Structure formats: C-alpha cells, structure tokens
C-alpha cells in the first residue's frame, strides 16, 4: 500500500508541479522530534481538554477505498456521452427559452457543467444581449418559472439583471391578486431571491417572504402528498436555498432527484452518474495522499489534545473546488486547514498564556534558530508549519517565479495574533461587543489564510497587487466569506466551546450587549448571515467585470467556502464532532460510496 501513499501521481493543475513533495526543499529537524509529547510537569494540571472524539477514519481503511465502477470502459462511455451533451448545447437554438434554461440548470446541479463552461456562457450571453440589461417584465404567472430561472442563472454567472423584472408580480402579491398553484414556479422564485444584493429591497421584503410562506403552506398541506417529488423539492429548498448549498453534496442529491423527473434525459442521467464516480476516484486519491501526509507529521499521534480531522479538513476543499483537475490545490489547502486546526486547538485548549505569547512571536519572526525557546509540543507544531509553508512557497517560486513566503508568513502571523486576542479575552473574562468581536473573529476563523494559499496555488500568474490586498485584509469578498464561516461556526459550536472554556461567541456577545434572549440572539446572527450573503453577491457581480482585480474563480471559491461552512455546521459542530453533525455520513456519501451503475 505504500505506493498509494508515495508513488501515486497527484492530479495537478500546472505541469511544473508534477513532482510536488517528491523533491522537497531541505527540512529543518529538531533533535527531540522523535518523541515530542507535551511536557509532563505540574503545569499540565492547569491545562484544559477539548475532549474531542478520535477520528472516525482509520488510515488503513482510507488507503483501501476505491470506486469499483471506474474503469477504462466507463471513461470511454463518459467521453461518448459528453459529446452527445455538447451537441445538445450546440443545437440549443431549436429549443424554447425555458428548455435552454432548464438544461443549463440541470447540468449545473448534476455537477457536469464544468465540462461545458464556454457553451453555457455563450448561451447566457446571448440571453443577456437579446434582452438588454433588463429582462422583459414578467406580467403573467405562467411565465414566472422561466423568468425567475433566467434571473438566477444570469446573476449567478455575473450578468447584471434588475429585480424590477418582478414588479408586476410584486404588485399582484401586495394586492393579493397573485394566483398560481404552480409550486415549481414558486420554488424557482424563492431560489432566485437568494441572489439578492443589499440594494434589492423588493427581493428581500416581498418576494422571499411570500415565496417562503407559499412553499411552507404546500409542505404542510396533507392533500398534496400525491406529488412526492415536488414535496421533496419544496422541503429541500426550505432547508437551505440552493445558492447557499455545498455544490458537490447538492450534485449527489440531485442525481437521485433528477431520475425521478418525468422529463429526465436518460443519457444525461447516465453521464452524470459516470462522471460522479470518476471525479470521486480523483478525490479518493487526494484523501489517501493527505492521510499519509498527516500520519507522517505525527501531529495527530503525538499531540493528544488536538482534533484528528484530516479527512474533514480535506472535505472542506471538496466544497471549495471539486473538479478533478484541481487535486494539487485541494491537497495544499487541506494541509493548510490541518495546520490551522492544530494551531487553533493549541490556542483554544492547551497552551498557557505565556506559551501562546512565545508561539505568536515565533510565527511572526519565522526564525527556526529560536526553536528551543518553545515547549516541546509547540516545537513539533511550529517545525511542521515552517517546513510545509516554505515547501509550498518553494513550489510557487519554481513554477511562477515569485516569492510568496513573506505573504504566507504575514497571513499566519495575523491568524495567530487573532487567536492570541481571543485567548486573552478568555483569560481576562472580557466580554467584547459584537462589532469588536467580529473585527477579530473574521480573521481568527482562518478563511483569509486558507484563501491566500488557494490564490497562490491556483493562479497561473500571481499579482503582487492582489497579494498585498489579501494580506492587508482589503478584499471584501474574503471578509464576507469569513464572516459567514464565523457566524455559521458560532451558531453550531458556541454551547460546546463555552462549556469547555472559550471566549464568548457572536450569539453571547449580542445577548450581553442587548439583553435579549438566546433565541433572539440566534435569530439576529442568522440575519447577519443573510445580510453578509447580500454583500457577497454584490462582490461576485463586481468581480464579473473586466476591471476587477480578482478572478471570478477566486470569488466563486470564496463563496464556496461560505457554502461549505453552512454544510459543515448545518447540524452541529461538523469539524469537532463530525459523527453527531452528520458529516461522517456526508463524507461517506461523497468520498467513499460510488453511485451504482446498471
């Protein structure tokens, strides 16, 4: 099995990194690294424990997983089916407006649109050019499904579309003259409302509340149980809107749902299932790689107090960028996420105030010659961080001729300083305001650190201007992504974290600041998430313009990180207690279990 760990060629984006981790820069090794356990002394009596459960994933088991349905025959079949779908898109002019839109929507939800990005963009561009900046106003209930779907798809792809297209429908809603029993149209309208920006008052105040109420009434109406598929779609939409969902998990759900549709396309369904299995195989190779890396570091085995969550750390990256050709990027970001998890646990749980000051200074100075100033358990952590980040920087320098290590260093230093602020708040019993808490918490949630490493790994040509804006925390889309991640985390984890000893989270800060109940505070935080999505939608539209510094793919990945947070924390602390929060089941579904092929 060793060949799976070392010899398997990673799936990579750039040819020059094909030997990633096979030839590495010289590593620094501490003399005491062969056995690095936390110091056994009376000081340990003052240390806290997170009481985290062990990993749900055995390393040997991970090395053994494979998709039995992926073979040369299926790869050839996918190629043939892909050509058929491509032909459908090329001959789309013979289809109606609604048929074109539904085909694009199906391709996206089935997870295969990445094969046809140019064709899809051409179709949507034609829609936009034909209609002008404002689509015709929808004045008939029977046109609502097509108009709402077009609105959502165009906005999702960065085209400017005004909410005014719904003015006639809004007038009917407000005058109680809207008449339609087509729940499909209402669900489509509901989903479209989540592409709103902060200036879209009609979507916020009229359309979303109306559509939500209509869907709830449909779900609650026992006489509607005859249409099981529509009922499932309605419940699914109310649970989390499509725009906020983790794309890959949605794909797995929709493949099953699509086959139940009366008008489903047989070869499109087959194409989606085969493609899912092939992509899953790429993800399985990634998991084997990062699991071997984690085992080699000894962080999980030697630092008993940290969360052993390498699979969950990798799972985050599938939510960020799932396409098979980006395996190198997923592996890099998974390693970054694993290091973040370890360091977070040191600051949150184990480190003393004095030790945390030392570690923060060490990361800020990035001086390996001062390693002996750290306690033994911190040496292993810092040395691993030092080696991995320098190796990543070396890869970028070789491939892209730019030294990004100073930017990486600053990002990690800022993260550790944010962790230290929270540790001091907890130690001193300080209760920050919501504003003060969030100014620090959007950094301490680690999204800026993850995204700067993503940017350097992904970008073919790295811009110093963008790097500077990222490390200076000037990119609003990063702040928005981090804010959603922080608030989703707070809603799911704050009770457990407070019980074991941690700084107040946004819910408790708002309760303390305003005197409201916990239920009211949680509602307020949920509203903060919704408002932040509006900001992020605006940033995504801005990024679609040619003058934008950030690529659309970077912005989409930042949004995907926010989506992933709502998946990970939907049912509780998916990172700390993955089995209780249904994350183990979701990992099993996406990374282990293939889709059976007839």
Curated annotation (Swiss-Prot):
<dbReference type="InterPro" id="IPR008949">
    <property type="entry name" value="Isoprenoid_synthase_dom_sf"/>
</dbReference>
<feature type="binding site">
    <location>
        <position position="348"/>
    </location>
    <ligand>
        <name>Mg(2+) 2</name>
    </ligand>
</feature>
<feature type="transit peptide" description="Chloroplast">
    <location>
        <begin position="1"/>
        <end position="30"/>
    </location>
</feature>
<dbReference type="InterPro" id="IPR034741">
    <property type="entry name" value="Terpene_cyclase-like_1_C"/>
</dbReference>
<dbReference type="Pfam" id="PF01397">
    <property type="entry name" value="Terpene_synth"/>
</dbReference>
<dbReference type="GO" id="GO:0034002">
    <property type="term" value="F:(R)-limonene synthase activity"/>
</dbReference>
<dbReference type="GO" id="GO:0050550">
    <property type="term" value="F:pinene synthase activity"/>
</dbReference>
<dbReference type="InterPro" id="IPR005630">
    <property type="entry name" value="Terpene_synthase_metal-bd"/>
</dbReference>
<feature type="binding site">
    <location>
        <position position="348"/>
    </location>
    <ligand>
        <name>(2E)-geranyl diphosphate</name>
    </ligand>
</feature>
<feature type="binding site">
    <location>
        <position position="489"/>
    </location>
    <ligand>
        <name>(2E)-geranyl diphosphate</name>
    </ligand>
</feature>
<feature type="short sequence motif" description="DDXXD motif">
    <location>
        <begin position="344"/>
        <end position="348"/>
    </location>
</feature>
<feature type="binding site">
    <location>
        <position position="497"/>
    </location>
    <ligand>
        <name>Mg(2+) 3</name>
    </ligand>
</feature>
<keyword id="KW-0460">Magnesium</keyword>
<comment type="similarity">
    <text>Belongs to the terpene synthase family. Tpsb subfamily.</text>
</comment>
<dbReference type="GO" id="GO:0050552">
    <property type="term" value="F:(4S)-limonene synthase activity"/>
</dbReference>
<dbReference type="InterPro" id="IPR050148">
    <property type="entry name" value="Terpene_synthase-like"/>
</dbReference>
<keyword id="KW-0150">Chloroplast</keyword>
<dbReference type="InterPro" id="IPR001906">
    <property type="entry name" value="Terpene_synth_N"/>
</dbReference>
<feature type="binding site">
    <location>
        <position position="344"/>
    </location>
    <ligand>
        <name>Mg(2+) 2</name>
    </ligand>
</feature>
<dbReference type="GO" id="GO:0009507">
    <property type="term" value="C:chloroplast"/>
</dbReference>
<dbReference type="Pfam" id="PF03936">
    <property type="entry name" value="Terpene_synth_C"/>
</dbReference>
<feature type="binding site">
    <location>
        <position position="489"/>
    </location>
    <ligand>
        <name>Mg(2+) 3</name>
    </ligand>
</feature>
<keyword id="KW-0464">Manganese</keyword>
<feature type="binding site">
    <location>
        <position position="486"/>
    </location>
    <ligand>
        <name>(2E)-geranyl diphosphate</name>
    </ligand>
</feature>
<feature type="binding site">
    <location>
        <position position="307"/>
    </location>
    <ligand>
        <name>(2E)-geranyl diphosphate</name>
    </ligand>
</feature>
<dbReference type="InterPro" id="IPR008930">
    <property type="entry name" value="Terpenoid_cyclase/PrenylTrfase"/>
</dbReference>
<feature type="binding site">
    <location>
        <position position="344"/>
    </location>
    <ligand>
        <name>(2E)-geranyl diphosphate</name>
    </ligand>
</feature>
<dbReference type="InterPro" id="IPR044814">
    <property type="entry name" value="Terpene_cyclase_plant_C1"/>
</dbReference>
<dbReference type="GO" id="GO:0000287">
    <property type="term" value="F:magnesium ion binding"/>
</dbReference>
<dbReference type="GO" id="GO:0010334">
    <property type="term" value="F:sesquiterpene synthase activity"/>
</dbReference>
<dbReference type="GO" id="GO:0034768">
    <property type="term" value="F:(E)-beta-ocimene synthase activity"/>
</dbReference>
<keyword id="KW-0809">Transit peptide</keyword>
<keyword id="KW-0456">Lyase</keyword>
<dbReference type="GO" id="GO:0050551">
    <property type="term" value="F:myrcene synthase activity"/>
</dbReference>
<dbReference type="GO" id="GO:0043693">
    <property type="term" value="P:monoterpene biosynthetic process"/>
</dbReference>
<comment type="function">
    <text>Involved in monoterpene (C10) biosynthesis. The major products are alpha- and beta-pinene, sabinene, beta-myrcene, (E)-beta-ocimene and limonene.</text>
</comment>
<dbReference type="GO" id="GO:0080015">
    <property type="term" value="F:sabinene synthase activity"/>
</dbReference>
<comment type="pathway">
    <text>Secondary metabolite biosynthesis; terpenoid biosynthesis.</text>
</comment>
<dbReference type="InterPro" id="IPR036965">
    <property type="entry name" value="Terpene_synth_N_sf"/>
</dbReference>
<keyword id="KW-0934">Plastid</keyword>
<feature type="binding site">
    <location>
        <position position="348"/>
    </location>
    <ligand>
        <name>Mg(2+) 1</name>
    </ligand>
</feature>
<dbReference type="GO" id="GO:0016102">
    <property type="term" value="P:diterpenoid biosynthetic process"/>
</dbReference>
